[in-house]
């Protein structure tokens, strides 16, 4: 369904980011100790009409595995 394609970079969900749903850049820096996070084009295969211009998050130079002890990294 749509959830598999939905990401912290999806334009339609970007306004919903915040404490519980970090932006791509914040997610990568905090959860992976990465230099930065960037969004790249990733057309939705499951939900193209609900997620036009879909994007996914990519962490640049991640130094650690995801910090699962931090609740804001779980999503």
Curated annotation (Swiss-Prot):
Record's GO cellular component terms: extracellular region
Superkingdom as given in the UniProt entry: Eukaryota
Cellular location(s): Secreted
Transmembrane segments: none
GO biological process: one example: defense response
Disulfide bond entries: 2-9, 24-28, 31-73, 39-47, 57-59
A Pfam family matched in the record: Macin
UniProt keyword Disulfide bond, yes or no: yes
Function field: Has a bactericial activity.
Family: Belongs to the macin family.
Protein name from the UniProt record: Theromacin
UniProt source species: Hirudo medicinalis
């Amino acid at each position: 369904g749509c959830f598999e394609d939905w990401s912290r970079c999806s334009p339609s969900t970007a306004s919903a980011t915040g404490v519980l749903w970090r932006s791509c850049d914040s997610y990568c820096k905090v959860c992976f100790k990465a230099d930065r996070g960037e969004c790249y084009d990733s057309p939705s295969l499951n939900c193209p009409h609900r997620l036009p211009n879909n994007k996914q998050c990519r962490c640049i130079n991640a130094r650690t595995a995801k910090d699962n002890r931090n609740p804001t990294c779980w999503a």
